[in-house]
Regions:
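General small-molecule cofactor/ligand-binding pocket signal
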Residues: 72-77, 144, 150, 230-232
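Acidic, Mg2+-coordinating active-site environments of NTP-dependent enzymes
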Residues: 14-103, 109, 113-128
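C-terminal helical cap/extension that packs against the catalytic core
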Residues: 56-70, 85-87, 192-248
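Nucleotide phosphate-binding/pyrophosphate-handling subdomain across enzymes
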Residues: 8-18, 22, 96-201
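Short, flexible loop segments at boundaries between secondary-structure elements
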Residues: 271-276
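Cofactor-binding loop segments of dinucleotide-utilizing enzymes, especially the Rossmann-like FAD-
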Residues: 21, 56, 180-184, 206-207, ...
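Positively charged, low-complexity/disordered segments
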Residues: 1-7
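A glycine-rich beta-strand to alpha-helix segment
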Residues: 237-266
Length: 276
């Protein structure tokens, strides 16, 4: 109750609402079309406040709602812009006469970072080194590199595309083993199809969740790819094997998978340190 009260209070006092993008996910609760999901997400927009939209192809249910109730709407591709080339990206918000160029990509999603920049520029005029701040910002669980592992909580086709963009920028022409577990209510076929060409071996891990079915996931993976598929009774088992083999490895598919992989890596590193 205390958390709910605090969260509700923050919502009531917010000056800016940000909707980064709309993709098919959590259809059971949000709806089966982008317009339906957009309508649900648009509920965070506040009357008389600022709405920031982080996609140039937002559903009409979002853009129309924002224009209807927000005092100002900023949308990617219109009121602020992003461009990228190689390992750099640039940002501009013309009506504020502000732009940044040649920002190191890091592991941040460019569009989401641009939303945060736009929000800051709408609230404050502080003269700070934005480029330095952005390049020093790191999100755990998003394209996070630890030794020869890349951990990413991507669990739908859209977020996997962001992971692929990161791989193309930073690890071009490298093949990875995958440590992968995704819930049965996700679009597993599309997820696997998107990233399959980057994967040499699939390690499918069992996780304790009523939405998870390892036999079904293995069948889908074997049907889509012609790569080796290895079954593990835990994320720890897959991480331990990959850790000692020192093969480049991507961990993705769910928050649970990545969380357990973080724990496994830390435990194995600690054990190895104690042995030496």
């Amino acid at each position: 109750p205390l958390y709910s009260s605090a969260a509700s209070d923050v919502y009531k006092r917010q000056d800016i609402s940000i909707i980064t993008n709309i993709e098919l996910d959590h259809e059971k609760w949000l709806g089966s079309t982008l317009e339906q999901i957009g309508l649900q997400k648009a509920a965070i927009l506040k009357q008389g406040k600022i709405g920031i939209l982080g996609s140039d192809s937002m559903p009409l249910s979002v853009t129309s709602k924002s224009k209807e109730i927000c005092k100002k709407t900023l949308q990617l591709g219109k009121e602020f812009r992003v461009s990228s080339q190689n390992n750099k990206w640039s940002y501009s918000i013309p009506h504020k006469n502000f732009e940044l160029e040649d920002i190191d990509s890091g592991n941040l999603n460019h569009e989401s970072a641009a939303c945060a920049l736009s929000a800051y520029k709408m609230l404050l005029e502080d003269d700070i080194d934005f480029k330095k701040v952005i390049e020093a910002t790191h999100l755990p669980g998003r394209c996070h590199s630890i030794e020869h592992f890349i951990l990413d909580v991507s669990h739908n086709p859209a977020s996997v595309k962001n992971l692929i963009q990161f791989l193309d920028r930073n690890h071009k022409d490298i093949k990875f083993n995958a440590i992968f577990s995704a819930m049965s209510d996700k679009d597993c076929e599309s997820i696997i199809n998107e990233i399959s060409q980057y994967i040499s071996e699939w390690n499918i891990c069992s996780i304790e969740d009523t939405r998870f079915n390892i036999s079904e996931l293995i069948n889908i993976t074997e049907h889509i790819t012609n790569k080796s598929v290895v079954k593990h009774d835990s994320v720890y088992s897959a991480v331990e094997r990959s850790y000692h083999e020192k093969v480049p490895c991507i961990v993705f598919g769910s928050f649970i998978t990545v969380s357990q992989a973080y724990q496994a890596i830390e435990k194995i590193k600690k054990e190895n340190h104690e042995d030496h």
